[in-house]
Amino acid sequence: MGDCVAPKEDLIFRSKLPDIYIPKHLPLHTYCFENISKVGDKSCLINGATGETFTYSQVELLSRKVASGLNKLGIQQGDTIMLLLPNSPEYFFAFLGASYRGAISTMANPFFTSAEVIKQLKASQAKLIITQACYVDKVKDYAAEKNIQIICIDDAPQDCLHFSKLMEADESEMPEVVINSDDVVALPYSSGTTGLPKGVMLTHKGLVTSVAQQVDGDNPNLYMHSEDVMICILPLFHIYSLNAVLCCGLRAGVTILIMQKFDIVPFLELIQKYKVTIGPFVPPIVLAIAKSPVVDKYDLSSVRTVMSGAAPLGKELEDAVRAKFPNAKLGQGYGMTEAGPVLAMCLAFAKEPYEIKSGACGTVVRNAEMKIVDPETNASLPRNQRGEICIRGDQIMKGYLNDPESTRTTIDEEGWLHTGDIGFIDDDDELFIVDRLKEIIKYKGFQVAPAELEALLLTHPTISDAAVVPMIDEKAGEVPVAFVVRTNGFTTTEEEIKQFVSKQVVFYKRIFRVFFVDAIPKSPSGKILRKDLRARIASGDLPK
């Protein structure tokens, strides 16, 4: 019998902060409102546009009323509802109400085209849509065909219910719901490391764990308290905002100031008026703050925490923003929808903060494990060596909805979620992201799936082949550009192709440049060699 070789141990990294107790058995809504006895009469939500304010007790009660209203409309435990909404108080009531009902919320971008919304409606099998009147036309025909109820938060068109009907329901008529911690509560859509958008199943346990990793314990990684005012400018259909603002904000008892869309002057006015203390942002907002000359006219001294996520932030931009917020700690977090979403967070935000390095995106969150692996061999790597970032813990997704194959390629047999991002962990446990294995393009923090745009381009009668890759852009971070092979004899122009795409997709998926080539580089198995195309862009070797 040959020698027995011991398996090589994984090199696993953990947070500098000690693990904490996490009440993973609690439903998400119970967990978020667990401290309501201390904050019940305090302002919970402020509508920035109108000044309307809701206390914690009112938000909790209205959420239970919405749950009862959903029940009366026939929404059962395990059913899915779609939130097709901008940021608004109703977003909170609808999401939390669905959670109380034991239902699932799938969040869709209201700027999606009709085709994009319907694709998500079909995939998620949503039974009800909560939206605004201006978006009803996108879904009304499909909803009528499938007998899906539409509810509007403003003036309800014909055949639509008004959201007030849900808020007027009697919460005492809501039947008791027994929620399993492994039940799905949120279903955002993400392209993951490759391919088309897929439903990401986030459970009660997963979101409770993710929120606790950030804001719970004696020394929270993200220190927030009941005197804080947090601005909600990031769209709640994005998991970063849903988690870091809605869930973390409620758990920590902060006041959440809601803005529908980013506009620099109203944004600065609200920060000054309400003395905002916490700003969860993305790089395009950080860039606007750094470059806008009007910023200096406003008093931003109340802001103590500026966190940036969804895409990396450069050192120069970090320094420019620090100058605008004199009393703020600035740092980055790193997330991925499938990871719940937070993998790493800056320890400068902790109650007892640590010194951090510029350009780092934090250290791995508590109650989780991280490793860096060689993308070719899957062997774990030591500090300061670049490899694929992997995360393991209760916060990660249950899997992709109805897609076991994609789930298996993302979460391995040992429970490690493979992110498709390349990075390294330094001697001080700080994580740096340097590249991306995955195909996703990040436009202002929004995901763009190349496969989706390639499939669309190939429906054009004069295009025989196409590939979509990112190009660096100062304002957007990255923009999608297309390499296109024209069908023999056709002289289709760049502008014609750009218009063809823009009519069918949301604004951030529009093609910014089209380069005509004789062939798309591919591997022997037929896979597009995106690295070759990215290298051509980087070197400036582009067709005229």
Swiss-Prot record:
Q: Where is this region: SBD1?
A: 263-332
Q: Provide this UniProt record's keywords sorted from A to Z.
A: ATP-binding, Ligase, Magnesium, Nucleotide-binding, Phenylpropanoid metabolism
Could you tell me which Gene3D superfamilies the record lists for this protein? 3.30.300.30, N-terminal domain of ligase-like
Q: Does the keyword Membrane apply?
A: no
State the Gene Ontology BP annotations.
phenylpropanoid metabolic process
Positions that bind ATP: S190, S191, G192, T193, T194, K198, Q332, G333, T337, D421, R436, K527
Known EC number: 6.2.1.12
Catalytic reactions of this protein = (E)-4-coumarate + ATP + CoA = (E)-4-coumaroyl-CoA + AMP + diphosphate; (E)-4-coumarate + ATP + H(+) = (E)-4-coumaroyl-AMP + diphosphate; (E)-4-coumaroyl-AMP + CoA = (E)-4-coumaroyl-CoA + AMP + H(+)
Concerning InterPro entries, the annotation shows: AMP-bd_C, AMP-bd_C_sf, AMP-binding_CS, AMP-dep_synth/lig_dom, ANL_N_sf
Q: What's this protein's name? A: 4-coumarate--CoA ligase 1
